[in-house]
Amino acid sequence: MSLGNRIFNGIVNVIISAAAMYGLWLLMRVCVFDYFTIPTNSMCPTLKPGDKVIVNKLLMGARIYTDYDFDIHGQELKSFRMKGIRTIRHNDIVVFNIPVHDGKISFIINKNMCKRVVAVPGDSISVVDGYYRNNNYDKALGLESMQKRLIEMPDSMMRGIVLDAYPFNGNVGWKIKKFGPMYVPRVGDVINMTPNDAAIYKRMMEWELGKEITWDRQKNVVYADGKPIKRYTFKHNYYFCAGDNVLDSDDSRYWGLVPEEYIIGIVAKTIHSS
């Protein structure tokens, strides 16, 4: 074989090897792990801006897209999830796609958040005197030291902090210091619908049904596209996710629940920036 052919074959082999390594790296990021940089202080002091987290996708199962025609303005998420090792647990830190845009649930790729799970499907979550309380979990949720700061700080001192909470409905009347109880639906759960329930679950129901949810308080009736409904059966699992820095975190207290499909994976390792 001539020197020229040997050089050519060597270059081809290097290119093939590099392409194979790149393909393997992409496959690993899709199915096994991925990494994200923390952009805000919402998880302080646990995670600080600039920290990197490695997400284990094997634990709950990797999410595989079935439609790669992404719309940066929001769209329906089309995907399935591979079989995982375990379900999400209380106090897991997860990375997920921000679920709410323009007041409704929609999917935008590469718009992510990192928060702590304080309620899983089937739980009832409350904030009582500033502290998270869960009917199915009697240990601390999040950082109680930060929750203590929340309850000890007078409202008059909380400049720039939104005290009202999801669903921002006067009849429900929830605040970040006194919230819930809010039931976190799981697949197959049936909830009898009152106007207050409709206000709480409107976003999730409209996402699942593709119909407008309204209500008449005087008649105590809830409507889906104008048709009365007495109860609703949920089609998805949901999670309540919140930042450890309860004084400065945009989370489920303000925009509601995270659909399971939007969760990318569970944080397995942190690489601190300093």
Model region roles, listed by residue range:
Residues 35-36, 102:
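Secondary-structure boundary/capping signal
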Residues 3-8, 44-274:
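Soluble "head" domains of membrane/secretory-pathway proteins
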Residues 12-31:
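Hydrophobic membrane-insertion alpha-helices, especially the h-region
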Residues 34-35, 119:
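Cytochrome P450 fold signature focused on the C-terminal beta-domain
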Residues 36-46:
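N-terminal signal-anchor transmembrane helix
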